Structures are given as C-alpha cells and as structure tokens.
Amino acid sequence: MSKFLFTAAAIVFLSCAPAQAADKPENFLPPDALDLTAILPPPPANDSPVTRAELAEIHRVQAGASAAQNAQAKADTQEDAYVFASVLGANFTAGKLPAAAPFLEHVREAEKEFVDPAKKALGRPRPPLVDSTIATCETLRPSGAYPSGHATTGYLFAVVLAQIVPEKREQIFSRAAEYANNRVLCGVHYPSDVEAGKISGSLIGAMLLQNPAFKAELGPAKAEIRRVLGLPSQ
C-alpha cells in the first residue's frame, strides 16, 4: 500500500497542477482541485467478503489492545496538528504558537474541503452500523466512513510538519501511522477507510507544497515553530 500511496500522490500531483494556481482566499486550494472519488478505489460493499474480513479484523484489534493502547485511541479522537506533540515536544501547542496556529488550522481546512464531499458521495456506513457488536471509543459521527478524515488529517499534517522539522521526519510519519490506525481500534473505521485516508492526506499535502499561498504562510510558521521547539533556524 505504501508504494501505491506515493505512486498515486505523484500521479495526482501532476494531473492537478493547473487547478492549484486558482487559489481561493478562504482555502489554499479551490474545491475542484481534487476529486477523491475519482482517485480512490470504491469502498467495499457492506455485504462483501472484504467488509466481513475487515469487521473481523476490527474485532481482533480490539480484543488484543492493552489499556494503554485503548487510552491512546481515545486521546486520538482529537483532530488537529497538536497530536504530534508526542514527537515534537510539550511546547508544540496552539497557545505557544500564535503565528503558526492559524496556519495549521488553515492546513486542516484542506482536509475538510476534499474529504467531506467524498464521504458524502461514497456513503460507506461506519462499522458499528453494519455490526452492532463493535464497540467505539467515541460517539459515532454522522459522516460516512470512507475515507477516514482523521487518517487524512494525520498524513496531511505529517507531510507539512516534515517540511518544518525534517530532523524528525521518520518519527512524524510513524506518529501519523499510529494516529490513523487508532481509528480502527476506536471502532469507527474499517482498515480500508484508514488506507484511503493515508492516500488522501498524502495527495493533499503534495498539492499544498506546490501552492503559492501555502508557501507564503509556511515560512513564518516554520520559523516560529522551530524557535519555540528550540531548533536552529533553516
């Protein structure tokens, strides 16, 4: 899947380049810059062998989880950049980043812009709506399951934060994977939802890296984050 993820990112990056220039003030990218329903494989049908196998996998993951893993999955219902504080340090908080915090929220809006329409169009019900014996670590959200918004957000922020703190690139992506996979443990996503989210976040991140408005905001945000984290300027 990782090979497909980066191959897909490269393909979509090239195909979407012209649309990226049409930046909108409220978002880095225009709504028509990316149609995830045209890129992602369709989700498995509710009564398919794949879905049945995924439901069994959710049960297996939940049965084997420790108390600490369950607590982390619960904590990871939070959906913002600061879930990476475990990698970047205790100073990585909105309160200590007055300049970077709005930038990071601006980045997160890109996930909503592209994932929300895809969820609505694809309409995959969340696992407990198909198998009521699956427990969840949060109140079930009304949005569709595919692709996972949390997984998209995690990988989108991983792409961006790896540009800001390249020294911790490996740890950042490891944390993104943990964060994304915890949606399965939480019982609110199938594994294929999470994989689709990883692809989506990587695609959106690749597009942002080429966006002029994003790059204009990245510089000051990077400078502040590195200063607050006690890292040398770049």
What does each of the following model-derived ranges do?
Residues 1-6:
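Bacterial N-terminal signal peptides that target proteins for export
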Residues 7-15:
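Bacterial N-terminal signal peptides
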Residues 22-185, 217:
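Hydrophobic alpha-helical bundle signature of multipass membrane enzymes
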Residues 123-128, 156-158, 194-202, 222-225:
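Short alpha-helical linear motifs
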Residues 178-209, 213-216:
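Interfacial helix-loop-helix junctions of multi-pass membrane proteins
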Residues 210-234:
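Acidic, carboxylate-rich catalytic segments that either coordinate divalent cations
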